[in-house]
């Protein structure tokens, strides 16, 4: 058994929640793309601490994770799906866009909708080289954020504010900047929840500071 195989075996045979978490941490620390399938599998285990360790390990591996994770997103386990969407959002590769748009709009699990909504702002939009394609996809994302700004769940609306803040800071998203600012202004004034209003006000303050530096 190879060294990496031993780490994978330790994950697969862990006899307690704490042992599993430690085994996942050790596997993630190997920083090997060969560990990706095992780390993805851990997202579906009923062990939040181990899943969080797997999330961190997958994020550290970067773009190599995107294709296998998209192929293996769990349609039945919403907890695993939420972790997976968080990974995709943190990595930020636009190959995940269509999955994120669908999840943000229609996933039945609030945790998945929140994670996908935030991820629309953290995508690395500059990786879409064709400007007309990028602008069209940015408008798709903005339409979903506008829709989710009316969600009953305050946490989804909060995620909209976070996504708008990230989008507003991206040079690649300058084509929708005025629309982003307009939606931030609307939410900062009219959202019924003070936490959402405050988050949007923070984004606008950041914008104001950047304009004067």
From Swiss-Prot:
This protein's GO CC annotations: phycobilisome
Keyword Flavoprotein: no
Presence of the UniProt keyword Mitochondrion in the record: no
InterPro entries (UniProt xref): ARM-like (IPR011989), ARM-type_fold (IPR016024), PBS_lyase_HEAT (IPR004155)
Keywords: Antenna complex, Lyase, Phycobilisome
One Pfam family of this chain: HEAT_2
Gene Ontology MF terms in the entry: deoxyhypusine monooxygenase activity; lyase activity
EC number of the protein: 4.-.-.-
Family in the record: Belongs to the CpcE/RpcE/PecE family.
Quaternary state and interactors: CpcE and CpcF associate to form a lyase.
Functional summary from the UniProt entry: Required for the chromophorylation of the CpcA gene product.
Listed PANTHER family: HEAT REPEAT-CONTAINING PROTEIN 4, PBS LYASE HEAT-LIKE PROTEIN
Protein name according to UniProt: Phycocyanobilin lyase subunit beta
